[in-house]
Amino acid sequence: MGYLIDGYKPTDDQFKNLSHIGISFLRADNIKGDVVMTDGWDNIDEVVSSAHKNDVKAIISFGGGSYIVTSELMGVKKNRQNLIKNIVRFMAKHNLDGFDCDWEPSWLDDKKEMESVNNAISHHYIKFIKELRIAIDAEFGKGEKSFSAAVMNANNIWYSDQKQISHFPQNGWWHFLDWVALMNYDNDLGAKHSTFESVYGPNGSVKYWNSFGVPLEKIVTGIPFYARAGWGEEWLFYKDIVKMNTNLSFETDFIMYKKNGLNEKEYGFNGKSTIVKKVQENKKLNLPGIMFWQLAGDVEVNSEHSLLRAINKNLN
């Protein structure tokens, strides 16, 4: 599954290498549960129609990393149920094939405030997941629409002073989902960003979430189509790295680069060889699939450097 933002419409060649697209993001516009899309999605129906013409499922993704979900929204039954009603209506209106819950921890400089905001996940996550599953099945028929969620590489905000902020509760919310996608990126910086070991190693994300309770048959791993050197603007699309390095080796997973006058740093990404290795490990573990953020970061799919092409070729 490839995530799309800002109205990005995949090419037909890209669609041929996809099973699902995640249209990002739908958000609550207020604590009453009214919903609105992020900027750029005036063409949502066109993108959904193109996906369906190519036998690709179009899923709506809710939330996102920069979006703050509050207890006033999720902890108040009337507001939560109004949100659920509006999500179901939105799915029906735009002929969507599923819902992806990308309710993430919120990054706030004030750690006490961050802990308070993110307590909404611990206290209300399963209420939202369970009630939305019931509503989706009631409206469209049991199993007619997919329901998934995206979670952190591990169950904490690793770079905060308090490493156990914003737990996803260990109360079985995954039983209501078809799959759980691990956001296996932004876990570290430079050459340590999204390494094979951080996902599949003995202390990696797959092992962590499986031990947490999520069965392997529901775990979808995540791959970045970008490089990360620091927080904020210190990132690069994979396609820009290829453009700047015409002789880029398939084995290369980081480059040294100075962006916008900042200090030269390691920009860590997943090169083609690492992508292939990850896909092969996924198949070895019988995991159901791979997702990536985001499709616009890849080169043209007919390029030998295309990550989408490498994933599809080795997954199928």
For the regions a language model picked out, list residue spans one by one.
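Glycan-recognition patch characteristic of GH18 chitinases/ENGases
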Residues: 1-91, 117, 191-201, 217, ...
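Extracytoplasmic/secreted envelope proteins and their assembly/folding machinery
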Residues: 15-18, 44-48, 80-84, 88, ...
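Aromatic-lined carbohydrate-binding surfaces of glycoside hydrolases
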Residues: 63-71, 103-107, 154
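Substrate-binding surface in catalytic domains of secreted glycosidases
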Residues: 31-42, 85, 105-247
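Short, acidic/polar
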Residues: 3-17, 75-92, 157-173, 269-283
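Conserved, mostly hydrophobic/aromatic
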Residues: 21, 60, 101, 132, ...
